[in-house]
From Swiss-Prot:
It comes from the Bacteria. GO terms for molecular function: mRNA 5'-UTR binding. The keyword tRNA-binding does not apply. This is Translational regulator CsrA. It comes from Halalkalibacterium halodurans (strain ATCC BAA-125 / DSM 18197 / FERM 7344 / JCM 9153 / C-125). A translational regulator that binds mRNA to regulate translation initiation and/or mRNA stability. Usually binds in the 5'-UTR at or near the Shine-Dalgarno sequence preventing ribosome-binding, thus repressing translation. Its main target seems to be the major flagellin gene, while its function is anatagonized by FliW. Keywords: Bacterial flagellum biogenesis, Cytoplasm, Repressor, RNA-binding, Translation regulation. Homodimer; the beta-strands of each monomer intercalate to form a hydrophobic core, while the alpha-helices form wings that extend away from the core.
Length: 75
């Protein structure tokens, strides 16, 4: 892992099109600004992990008999 030190109002450039700026530092809270192309998803780590978990749950296979039971309940 690359570790860089930055002060308020300084930036880090990633590749040609991603810039991370230090907006402010207040105690143990750091506010970041991120400029990146719209096609790049940017999430807090805990949100990203929750999305991955939900996607994993949604991708699980369900036995056909269970699906038929659900359809019968609907109709």
């Amino acid at each position: 892992m690359l570790v860089l030190s930055r002060k308020s109002n300084e930036s880090i450039q990633i590749g040609d099109n991603i810039e991370i700026s230090i907006i402010s530092i207040d105690g143990d809270q750091v506010k970041l600004g991120i400029n990146a192309p719209r096609h790049i998803d940017i999430h807090r780590k805990e949100v990203y992990l929750a999305i991955q978990q939900e996607n994993s749950e949604a991708a699980k296979t369900v036995p056909l008999s269970q699906l038929k039971g659900l359809l019968n309940q609907q109709g």
